[in-house]
């Protein structure tokens, strides 16, 4: 989530040169860091490679997915990654194998100074119909549990795995009034870890709602929750 005022920093948007995807072998895919997660899942499906189905439900790109170890329905980027190619602050192109990446829940511990160029992934041969059916089922699960086709913050807070067995949505539900809003920023009725832009919510509206929820959960439950999304201001 980025400020709608001036941002005192540098934002790099990778061009179409980083949007390529191809097979390296029967079960290995190489994808540019600007390739969307959905496109990667579709490419894997078209080549009868399983293991990528969960990516069809994740918005964003390969680069961002690796950086935060994005995942859903029990699967994460670390489960399919072989290695990444990146460029350092000094301009050196390096390859980092997955075994050297300290993946955690929604984190990779990779340096913020790295710019990801591409990544290689390993799947396994699987019947095309089975892949399609799994993707359909995952999509149904997502649409039942999460707000879709509307403007939201996405999954906003991480589950506090080191503090409680409760999911973050459960903590929010018991700590924050469901009708709480700031401007046009409000809590989704379908999943309270998703915050909705009802029409014209500003950055500040959404930020205030996020901060209010975080403080309310801490006050009510004693659990300190951390944002899953990155906030740039």
Question: Which residue ranges define each predicted feature?
Answer:
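Short N-terminal helix-initiation segments at or just after the protein's N-terminus
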Residues: 28-32, 56-65, 100-102, 132-141
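Phosphate/pyrophosphate- and phosphate-bearing ligand-binding catalytic cores of soluble enzymes
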Residues: 87-211, 215-216, 220-233
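A structural signal for short hydrophobic beta-strand segments in well-ordered beta-sheet cores
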Residues: 20-24, 86, 157
């Amino acid at each position: 989530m980025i400020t709608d005022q001036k941002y005192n920093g540098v934002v790099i948007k990778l061009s179409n040169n980083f949007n390529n995807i191809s097979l390296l072998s029967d079960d290995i895919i190489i994808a540019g860091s600007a390739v969307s997660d959905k496109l990667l899942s579709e490419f894997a499906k078209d080549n009868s490679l399983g293991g990528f189905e969960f990516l069809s439900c994740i918005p964003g790109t390969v680069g961002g997915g690796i950086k935060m170890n994005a995942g859903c329905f029990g699967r994460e980027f670390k489960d399919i990654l072989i290695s990444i190619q990146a460029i350092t602050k000094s301009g050196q192109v390096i390859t980092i194998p997955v075994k050297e990446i300290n993946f955690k829940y929604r984190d990779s511990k990779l340096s913020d100074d790295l710019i990801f160029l591409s990544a290689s992934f390993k799947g396994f041969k699987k019947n095309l119909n089975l892949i399609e059916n799994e993707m359909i089922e995952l999509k149904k699960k997502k649409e039942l549990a999460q707000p879709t086709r509307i403007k939201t913050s996405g999954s906003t807070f991480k589950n506090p795995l080191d503090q409680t067995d409760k999911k973050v949505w459960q903590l929010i539900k018991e700590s924050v009034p469901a009708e709480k809003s700031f401007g046009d920023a409000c809590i989704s009725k379908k999943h309270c870890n998703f915050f909705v832009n009802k029409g014209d919510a500003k950055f500040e509206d959404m930020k205030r709602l996020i901060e209010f929820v975080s403080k309310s959960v801490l006050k009510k439950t004693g659990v300190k929750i951390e944002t899953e999304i990155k906030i740039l201001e």
